[in-house]
Amino acid sequence: MSTGTSPSSSPATQAVRLAPEARYADELARLHAADADARPTGWKLSPRAVRRFILGDEKLQVSRKFYGDDPLVDRAIVTLMGHQGLMLVGEPGTAKSLLSELLAAAISGDSGLTVQGTAGTTEDHIKYSWNYALLLAEGPSQRALVPSPLYQAMRAGKLVRFEEITRCPPEIQDVLISLMSDKQLMIPELGDDARLYAQRGFNIIATANLRDRGVHEMSSALKRRFNFETVRPIRDHSFEVELVMAQLKRELDGGGESPVDVPRDVVALLVTTFQELRAGQTQDGTVIKGLDAVMSTAEAVNVAYAAALQARHFNGGQLTAREIAGQLQGVVLKDSTDDVKRVRHYFDTVVRERGKRDAQWKTFHDAARALWQ
């Protein structure tokens, strides 16, 4: 049986996705060297340098990584300097997790301390668990204790990320209330006075989707422990086109793919389609039915990347509206028959009318009709 490639023979450069602190190590080093501002206790960079890392700095050759609401980034950084946790809420695909990763990488140098909220998340996942072999052999001890990411963050004075917190049952969410208020964790198995005190620099960044299934409302007591920031979809058309093109180039370059000709007007067509189906309104103000499916910028990049791969390997290396139409099915055809009807209506009316005046839109319409019969 093949065991695949051993970890030692797999260089980090071949990793599908590196953590931000590894991917942008050179940028972080330049920011650290040039950072003359005061740093909060436990922070790797000053607040100004954290902002530069996320929003970019041409002088230091630091790339922009988060697009959209710059003041939101400032407020998030300020929140993390205080005693409140940071709650990033918004629709799926609006880069909440990306922003939390970037903040953790810049502030703590470690974005990997993460609790993933699910229906199966238990108190042990938030606090600590035990190595039961050692527990049976030695009894309760520090050696037998298995620290959770939150425990490690408290001990080291770092940020911990809590992804999709509203997927956890309410009684599990509320475990955080005392931890965030008292900044200490009781460990009764190690003695009546055993406790872990959070070190300076510790805080929590949580994310929650506003429009998703299988979520639980947070208690008002827990909400009071967080400052809420809403991450909204990008509304500026040209800005979103530039972002999708930049992300697509990064994906193609990172995947080692041969060059693909990506016309801007094809990406603009994709972004227009996503924005109109997301907003339930066309560019000229005509009201249409929006979709239940997530039509985020991240999904647009996924569609563009899949279409570019199809163009490269099957259709001569030039991305056209034909590939976009084919890959759009994967976004819409998930679990909503109503969405399929709405998209067909969109193609039969809006796209068809534009196709009378524009060759790309005609290709888009004809390809979609052939695929979506």
Task: Give each language-model segment a name.
Residues R312-Q373:
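C-terminal engagement/docking regions of AAA+ P-loop ATPases
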Residues L99, E276, G330-K334:
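A short structural micro-motif
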Residues S46, T122, V146, R161, ...:
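A diffuse structural propensity rather than consistent per-protein peaks
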Residues A76, L270, F274, Q327-L328:
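Short alpha-helical scaffolding segments that buttress acidic/His motifs in well-ordered protein cores
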Residues D70, L248-L319:
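Conserved AAA+ ATPase small/helical "lid" subdomain
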Residues S2-E257:
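AAA+ P-loop NTPase catalytic core and its hallmark functional loops
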Residues R225, L243, A306-Q310, Q327:
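A general alpha-helix detector
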Residues R23, A49, P149, F239, ...:
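Exposed alpha-helical structural elements
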